[in-house]
Amino acid sequence: GTAMVKAFDLECGRTGILDHERAREAGFDPVSETITAGSRSGYYPGAAETTVTLTADRDTGRLLGGSIVGTDRAAIRIDTIATALGGEMTVAELERQDLGYAPPFSPVWDPVLVAAKVVNGSLP
């Protein structure tokens, strides 16, 4: 399932399989990467760091799960990952998504897309 929580200013979201042991039990060879990127264009007021972890299957590149932590509307980004999971996307397919850009709302490269690119680059 997909979940979001907020404690004071900190927002967290998670979806899918993140635990490597559980992924192996399900027949996957998991690989995870964690990145930290800006929530909006860096020059825009209110920009903050967002940390994204994605887990994928090493053999197929299929996205298995993800988590997000940050203070600037971070948790809602978990819906992008949940949608990709529902579509059984690979991290390469997620990386190519054309997410909206406007400085008040997001950086040119959304943190989820940056994470997908990093995971995709670590696959054989």
What is the predicted function of each stretch?
Residues G1-A7:
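N-terminal periplasmic "start-of-domain" segments of outer-membrane beta-barrel proteins
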Residues T2, D19-E21:
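Short glycine-/small-residue-rich flexible loop motifs, especially phosphate/cofactor-binding loops
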